[in-house]
């Protein structure tokens, strides 16, 4: 048994000795090669070192670029999510847009649809529109060029159906959405008057503009689009029973909230979430 164990232990020792001898011979060959060609070996080694350094630099550059791309992925995902959210909002608006306000109707019967769908404003609204056309030449109005229009957050069929029959009454989707477009037009007209210079307005309109500016500067209204109860004059929304029912529905669905400022009842439009 002992002899057998000794014979089994011998081959591994021989293998280690052979491997050690092989390493020694390789080192000897390398020493000989270096001593035989010293003049050519050093430049070659220098070239190899330069190439390796250049490759390391390229690898570092690639690694840095990859890290930049990885860091940009979360930002790109957020941008895609925002785009999808905006697309949902636009699809919701398009699906619930009153038929009389669609593009084809405007293309075929622009005058008729304009008179049917948009409210007939008084002289102050007309002057506010003229002011907007001229305001580009007015230095004080330059910072407000990018002001967004009043929000038009149309309701959907599902929202209308979710109301109690008592609240819904005889209201239709089209009637309510036409009213939404109309009150947004009131808010746009007020925003124009708030920003329009005095020299562009008549004396009567200027007095109203000053009053609107005081309202716009109040804490509850500041930074938001608004209209007054006094602005409601039709044709799509009037202060009759139907109009009051529409206002109740819009308030219930969160399209606006109202505050009392002085003797005015002020409706502040909500933005779509």
Curated annotation (Swiss-Prot):
Keywords, sorted A to Z: Coiled coil
Pfam family, one: SKA1
Classification via Gene3D superfamilies: Ska1 microtubule binding domain-like
GO cellular component, one term: mitotic spindle
Coiled coil: 77-97
Keyword Transport among record annotations: no
Biological processes annotated in GO: attachment of mitotic spindle microtubules to kinetochore; cell division; chromosome segregation; mitotic cell cycle; regulation of microtubule polymerization or depolymerization
An MF annotation (GO) of this entry: microtubule binding
InterPro entries xref list: SKA1, SKA1_MBD_sf
Protein family per UniProt: Belongs to the SKA1 family.
Protein's name according to its UniProt entry: SKA complex subunit 1 homolog
Gene source species: Zea mays (Maize)
């Amino acid at each position: 048994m002992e002899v057998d164990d000794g014979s089994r232990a011998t081959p591994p020792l021989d293998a280690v000795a052979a491997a050690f001898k092989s390493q020694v011979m390789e080192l000897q060959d390398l020493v000989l090669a270096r001593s035989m060609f010293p003049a050519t070996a050093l430049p070659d080694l220098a070239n190899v070192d330069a190439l390796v350094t250049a490759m390391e630099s390229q690898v570092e550059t690639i690694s840095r670029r990859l890290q930049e791309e990885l860091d940009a992925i979360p930002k790109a995902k957020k941008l895609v999510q925002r785009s999808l959210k905006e697309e949902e909002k636009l699809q919701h608006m398009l699906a619930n847009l009153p038929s009389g306000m669609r593009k084809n109707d405007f293309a075929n019967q622009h005058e008729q649809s304009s008179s049917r769908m948009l409210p007939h404003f008084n002289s102050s609204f007309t002057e506010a529109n003229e002011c907007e056309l001229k305001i580009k030449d007015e230095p004080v109005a330059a910072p407000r060029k990018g002001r967004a229009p009043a929000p038009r957050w149309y309701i959907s069929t599902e929202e209308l159906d979710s109301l109690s029959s008592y609240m819904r009454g005889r209201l239709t989707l089209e009637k309510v959405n036409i009213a939404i477009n109309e009150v947004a037009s009131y808010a746009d007209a007020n925003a124009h008057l708030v920003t329009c210079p005095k020299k562009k307005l008549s004396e009567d309109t200027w007095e109203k503009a000053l009053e609107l500016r005081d309202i716009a500067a109040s804490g509850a209204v500041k930074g938001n689009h608004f209209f007054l109860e006094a602005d409601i004059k039709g044709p799509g929304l009037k202060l009759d029973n139907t109009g009051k029912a529409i206002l109740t529905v819009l308030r219930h669905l969160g399209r606006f909230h109202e505050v009392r400022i002085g003797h005015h009842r002020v409706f502040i439009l909500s933005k779509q979430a």
